[in-house]
Every structure is written in C-alpha cells, then in structure tokens.
Swiss-Prot record:
One of its GO terms (biological process) is nucleotide-sugar transmembrane transport. Residues 321-349 are annotated as: Disordered. Keywords: Membrane, Sugar transport, Transmembrane, Transmembrane helix, Transport. The keyword Transport applies. It comes from Arabidopsis thaliana (Mouse-ear cress). The chain crosses the membrane at residues 15-35, 49-69, 89-109, 113-133, 141-161, 165-185, 205-225, 236-256, 263-283, 286-306. This is Probable sugar phosphate/phosphate translocator At5g25400. It is found in: Membrane. Its main location: membrane. It holds the Pfam family TPT.
C-alpha cells in the first residue's frame, strides 16, 4: 500500500480513537447522572442524602487521584505552594462542594430531563459572571443570545409537569456556583500560569471539598443517618457509583487534546438529548411538548453561542499565527540586510 494509503489509515485510526473516547465520555457522564438519580430518588433506591453521596465520591476520587499521582506516577504532579493552595484552590474547592451538593440535591425533587433543560442556563451564568468580574467583554449580540437561552428555559419550565420550586432553586444555585467556579479558575489559577487537568484537580480540590462538606453534613445529615438503624452501607452500589464518577474524570483527562472544542460541545448536546429520551422512555418521567419546544429554543441559543466562541477562538489563533509569521519574516529580512551590509563593507583585493 502506498504512502497515501498509510496516511489514510493513520487518519482513520486517529478518528476512531477520538470518537471512542467521546463515546466513553458520553456513556460515563450519562451513567453518573442516572446512577445518582437512582440512589437519591425516594421512588427508587431511596437514599436521599446528597451531602453524604458527594462526600463518598470525594473520598474515593481523592484516594485514587493520590495513587495515580504519587504511587503509580501515571500523572505528573503540579508543584504548588501552601500560599497558592490557600488563596487559589480553597475558594475553588468551596464553590465546587456547593455546586455538587446542590446539583445532587436537585435529583430528589426534579426529573432528569428537566434538570438537563435547566443546565442549558450554564452559558448564561458563565457569561454574566465573567462580565461581572471583567473576564468577558459586554456585547449586545451575546446578551441577546443569553436572553434567548433564558427565554427557552423559561418556556421549558412553564411546561414542566413535575415542577418543584425548591428543586428549581437548588439546580439554579448549582448552576450559579459552578459558573462562578469556572470563572474563578480563570482568575485564580489560569492567570497565574497554573494548569490542572481533571486528575490533578481531584488531587488538590477533592480533599478540600470533603472538608467543606463535613460541616453541613454534621448538622443536616449525620443525625438522621445515626438514627436510621435500618440502613446498611452497600459497598457494591456506592463503590460502583464512586468508580463511575472517578472514571468520568479520567475520561475527560484522556480526551483532552484528542478532540476539538466543537466535538466536545456536540458530544455534550448528544448526551443531553439521550438523557431526556431515557428519562421519558425508561424512568417514565413526563416530557411535554412545551418542555421540548422551550428546550429546543435554548438548545439553538447554546449551539449558536458555542459556534461563536469557536469562531472567535479560531480567529485568535489565526491572528497569533499571522503575527508569528510576520515576526519571523521581519527577523529574516534583518538578517539578510545585515549580511548584505557586511559584504559591502568587506575590503576589495
């Protein structure tokens, strides 16, 4: 087979590997969401203790992250001073613990499908908080896009058959804390040149989350668990659930650099629609036409936002490349002029 054939085989192999990783990420993300719903929902496994579940996840993930970094040397550790940890990682850990606590709590009150629809507000929250902290520039066009997403989610909420005010407050709170966490990562870590992949993030952030969650757990859930004599810790259920949560982070780590931002965004959309379909067909949650119409509007707004962000990123990369080419051209011209000037100054025989 010729050189062209070998190249084609290599390209095909890379495509297969990339989309295999994407499929694994979709599967694990889907599994974690449905599994958490199964454990927390009072009509299913009936263990409505979201703080405890989150603490189990954090304990499991921090232990495995420690083993991968310190024992098996699978991931390179990131050097970090105590001052940097306290000033940068601890606030992010606090926000992450609140986001996980509230998002897991929402599964007790809301359907999986409706939660996915509410999560469409994430770009709105990230953009708004980014503008507030001056990490994003205010643009009328982008704000109109954000309003269209919000309008779509409002329609979806209006058509929700199992609308629960407390559940919606919890999920919106989770979105707000998660969006703030993402902006804080830019301010407290990225701006300082600190880059954490999902595994090193768990290594540094998970123990911090565990410490923050311990305070509300002692007050809210521990007294109830202590008095519930009928409960026995199911190692199979909680072990496999925690393993899926960690595997999801590992899948994200493996996926970094294998696909484009557009591919990841499309994968996220596919996952959301699959969850809505699963929630309707298997869990038997009610999904109304108004739900779908509203989410459709929000989905188009999110798709346009992702497309605009990707185009801006491409334009920035193209400008950076052009600048590098201009600098290289200027350097070569200077060298050429210098060489010519040197030859002119040489004495003739």
């Amino acid at each position: 087979m010729g050189k062209g054939g070998s190249l084609s085989e290599g390209v095909i192999k890379n495509i297969i590997i990339s989309y295999t990783y994407v499929a694994i990420w979709i599967f694990l993300s889907f599994t974690v969401i449905v599994y958490n719903k199964y454990i927390l929902d009072k009509k299913m496994y009936d263990w409505p203790f979201p703080i405890s579940l989150t603490m189990i996840h954090m304990s499991f993930c921090s232990t495995l992250a420690f083993l991968l970094i310190k024992v098996f040397k699978f991931v390179e550790p990131v050097s970090m001073s105590r001052d940097t940890y306290l000033r940068s990682v601890v606030p992010i850990g606090a926000l992450y613990s609140l986001s996980l606590w509230l998002s897991n709590s929402a599964y007790i009150y809301l359907s999986v499908s409706f939660i996915q629809m509410l999560k469409a507000l994430m770009p709105v929250a990230v953009y708004s908080i980014g503008v507030l902290f001056k990490k994003e520039g205010f643009k009328s066009e982008t704000m109109m896009n954000m309003l269209s997403i919000s309008f779509g989610v409002a329609i979806a909420a209006y058509g929700e058959a199992r609308f629960d005010v407390w559940g919606v407050i919890l999920q919106l709170g989770a979105v707000a804390f998660e969006a703030t966490r993402l902006v804080m990562i830019q301010i407290l870590l990225t701006s300082k040149g600190i880059t954490l992949n999902p595994i090193t993030s768990l290594y540094y952030v998970a123990p911090c989350c565990l410490a923050f969650l311990f305070i509300p757990w002692i007050v809210v859930e521990f007294p109830i668990l202590r008095d519930t004599s009928s409960f026995h810790f199911d190692y199979l259920i909680f072990g496999t659930n925690s393993f899926c949560a960690f595997a999801l982070n590992l899948a994200v780590f493996l996926l970094v650099g294998k696909t484009s931002a557009l591919t990841m965004n499309v994968a996220g959309v596919v996952k959301d629609w699959l969850l809505i379909a699963f929630s309707w067909s298997v869990i038997k949650d009610t999904v109304t036409p108004i739900n779908l119409f509203g989410y459709g509007i929000a989905f188009l707004g999110v798709a346009y936002y992702n497309h605009a962000k990707l185009q801006a990123l491409k334009a920035k990369e193209a400008q950076k490349t052009a600048q590098q080419v201009d600098e290289e051209t200027g350097r070569l011209l200077e060298e050429r002029e210098g060489n010519e000037g040197g030859r002119k100054n040489e004495p003739e025989d």
